[in-house]
Amino acid sequence: MKTAKRILALVLMATMLVSFAACSEQPAADDGKYTIGICQLVTHEALDAATKGFKDAVVEGLGEENVTFDEQNASNDTTMCKTITDNFATKKVDLIMANATPALTAAVTSTKDIPILGTSVTEYGVGLGIEDFNGTVGGNVSGTSDLAPLDQQAQMILDILPEAKKVGLLYCSAEPNSVYQVNKVKEFLDGKGITTAVYTFSDSSDVAIVAQKAADENDALYVPTDNTAAECSTAIYNAMTTKKPIIAGEQGICKGCGIATLSIDYYDLGVKTGEMAVEILKNGGDISTMAIEYTPQEKLTKMYNESICKELNIDVEALKNAGYVAIEQ
């Protein structure tokens, strides 16, 4: 009898331990506490601003005491992105914020259950390989796009640099969203009778030599929204022994090597992404029906780099009169 009682006690104890373990595996959101994993591809001004905006909006919506951020940086290593997002999935965080396309594609392969919000992703259809993309990813994925109107950026080349007849299109070949942007800008410029040439670098190791070649062979350059270019923007400018004007895809790149851009505000982009996170976590929003959010036209800003414009004898007063504002250095 004592043996039977001892066995029963052990069974009950084991059952209790399993129950406690099961309880500990429940998401922290059950008591209003949330853990959010942030995977940022690389450190540069635009992505940093998006992450800050995201965190500020989440804290505003959930309360600082109710959210813990597990913030990781992949140092521009796509393999590290996958390691980070796999770890988030193992930890069963309540939501993943993926900052930049490689972070998003990694997160999508790590989990089909945890909500994933992308930000600083230019074109979700291209990044995720979705044919006939209709604006909603579905499943456990949504987010915000940093795509600015490419035809308007291309038109800036014609407006600011009317004497430019040859334009080099410079970007990182490892970034599919850069290919998408360059193809659109090339199509626009070709239609206007401008001669275009494409120049690609594979990573930061060859960006300088490719940038110099592009500058030597063209009257002006276009650099799209591109994470490697953003990380190396100053190196791009310094590599040009003969300085040529660059129209940039966003203000961070323009700050390092460009004369002008039509840019979104990455902090505001992050804020919008954070508001989406609050809607999902606090209000029970259905991420599968959430369309990708884009910056409206009225929030885009025409910007110029005063120091580079002056160095290249670009008429700053004309830019001001056309509604351009100076980038803060």
Model-derived segments and their meaning:
Residues 35-55, 61, 70-79, 174, ...:
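Extracytoplasmic "Venus flytrap"
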Residues 176-244, 250:
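Pocket-lining segment of extracytoplasmic ligand-binding domains
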Residues 55, 60-81, 140, 186-204:
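Short beta-strand elements in bilobed, periplasmic/extracellular small-molecule ligand-binding domains
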Residues 70-132, 226-249:
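Beta-alpha junction/loop-to-helix N-cap segments that form part of ligand/metal-binding clefts
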Residues 1-35, 60, 64:
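Short, low-complexity disordered leader/linker segments with a strong preference
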Residues 30, 124-166, 264-285:
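Hydrophobic alpha-helical segments within soluble ligand-binding/sensing domains
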Residues 279-329:
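Hinge/cleft segment of the Venus flytrap/periplasmic-binding protein
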Residues 36-38, 54, 142-189, 286, ...:
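An alpha-beta-alpha
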